[in-house]
């Protein structure tokens, strides 16, 4: 029986060429799998037909937008996930979604190998292959760009030689990856970290410097899940989409950073994530109102580790699953409304309301009605600072 390879297919030049390239290099039949995580662009059926025209023996497309939002983006919102305190894991979250569909297709079609289009220099090769090995330990992985030196020039030459039905124009100088949770731009002139980004690289966000009227929005959460925008019920996907549009129109969610890649190098990345940043900002503030202090302090440590694990491609690891359980428990009381003003590139919280609130006005106020017993403060301070006081007596003697 002829071996089969499942290919993560985007519909672009590189993965279209990879179909024939893999067949020639390995003698295997190729099954192309395209997964829609809200990246936009061409119709899925057009992509499916192109894969078949390029030589795939089977081609599958999956509309995974709701799955991606609910099973991958939502946990990131609950975790307030910002890698290096800034990056909302736009690309890292989509990879396990795609991996899940690739492994399912491999089982369905009896394939023993899964292929992806990543280079040998980035994080995504690790995310794909670590995920595939976790869900299908028996499956092999190949990466034509990395393993067979399939450069873009060679891909174009192959495409023209085989007369494949895809444009062979030189691509943009940038490497772009996008989904409903955000957009990542790298390479080109951005590799010089002194160069400022130009406005042309942005698509999800308007120029925040352009004067415009501010937009006020109320986001409602139930146990950490966004359930309504301005009082109208939404799914998680709809919440992200609506905030992408509204926050993006105000220039919210632009990030320009040098980040530590898993492979050991530093890389300059420009991100747009208007919906993600607005939702995480709102969720984080609602946690400030509803989560007990010690739990909140410890959760911040968990959030950092959770984000690092997802960035590093360990979505399916035992520790990640255990941290999910902690984060879900910590979100049990994160229910209420957050009012935000979206304007000039910022999402600013201006109001909070929750039946689960731990904010006690009578304890917090300095005006009449204050119920905080200040007479207990002195004794508390004496006990609280006693250890340091004893040490100081020794050290200053």
Curated annotation (Swiss-Prot):
Does the record bear S-adenosyl-L-methionine in its keywords? no
Question: Which residues take part in binding ATP?
Answer: 8-16, 117
Q: Which residues cross the membrane?
A: none
Annotated residues for binding of L-citrulline:
87, 123, 127, 175, 259, 271
Enzyme class label: ligase
Molecular-function GO terms, alphabetical: argininosuccinate synthase activity; ATP binding
Q: Which reaction does it catalyse?
A: L-citrulline + L-aspartate + ATP = 2-(N(omega)-L-arginino)succinate + AMP + diphosphate + H(+)
Residues recorded as binding L-aspartate, renumbered to this chain, are 119, 123-124
Location of the protein in the cell: Cytoplasm
Could you provide one GO biological process annotation from this protein's UniProt record? urea cycle
Tell me the keywords, alphabetical order: Amino-acid biosynthesis, Arginine biosynthesis, ATP-binding, Cytoplasm, Ligase, Nucleotide-binding
How is the quaternary structure described? Homotetramer.
Query: What family is this?
Result: Belongs to the argininosuccinate synthase family. Type 1 subfamily.
Q: What is this protein called?
A: Argininosuccinate synthase
Q: Which gene encodes it?
A: argG
């Amino acid at each position: 029986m002829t071996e089969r390879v499942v290919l993560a297919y985007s519909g672009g030049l590189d993965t279209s060429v990879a179909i024939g390239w893999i067949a020639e290099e390995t003698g295997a039949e190729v099954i192309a799998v395209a997964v829609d995580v809200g990246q936009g662009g061409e119709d899925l059926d057009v992509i499916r037909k192109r894969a078949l025209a390029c030589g795939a023996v089977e081609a599958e497309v999956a509309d995974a937008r709701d799955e991606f939002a609910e099973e991958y983006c939502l946990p990131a919102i609950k975790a307030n996930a910002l890698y290096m305190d800034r990056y909302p894991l736009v690309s890292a979250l989509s990879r396990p979604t795609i991996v899940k569909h690739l492994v399912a297709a491999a089982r369905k079609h009896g394939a023993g190998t899964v292929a992806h289009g990543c280079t040998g220099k980035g994080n995504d090769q690790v995310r794909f292959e670590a995920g595939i090995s976790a869900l299908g330990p028996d499956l092999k992985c190949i990466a034509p760009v990395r393993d067979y030196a399939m450069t873009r020039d060679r891909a174009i030459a192959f495409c023209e030689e085989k007369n494949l039905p895809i444009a062979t124009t030189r691509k943009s100088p940038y490497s772009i990856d996008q989904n409903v949770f955000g957009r990542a731009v790298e390479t080109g002139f951005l590799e010089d970290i002194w160069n400022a980004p130009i406005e042309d690289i942005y698509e999800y966000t308007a120029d925040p410097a352009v004067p415009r009227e501010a937009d006020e929005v109320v986001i409602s959460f139930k146990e950490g899940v966004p359930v309504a925008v301005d009082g109208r019920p939404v799914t998680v996907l709809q919440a992200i989409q609506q905030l992408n549009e509204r926050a993006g129109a105000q220039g919210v969610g632009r990030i320009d950073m040098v980040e530590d890649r898993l492979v050991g190098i530093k890389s300059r990345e420009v991100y747009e994530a208007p919906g993600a940043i607005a939702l995480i900002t709102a969720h984080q503030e609602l946690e400030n109102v509803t989560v007990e202090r010690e739990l909140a302090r410890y959760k911040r440590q968990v959030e950092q580790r959770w984000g690092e694990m997802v960035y590093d491609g360990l979505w399916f690891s035992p520790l990640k699953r255990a941290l999910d359980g902690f984060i879900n428990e910590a979100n049990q009381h994160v229910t209420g409304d957050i009012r935000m003003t979206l304007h000039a590139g910022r999402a600013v919280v201006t109001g909070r309301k929750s039946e689960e609130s731990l904010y006690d006005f009578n304890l917090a106020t300095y005006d009449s009605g204050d119920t905080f017993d200040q007479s207990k403060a002195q004794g508390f301070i004496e006990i609280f600072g006693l250890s340091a006081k004893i040490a100081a007596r020794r050290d200053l003697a």
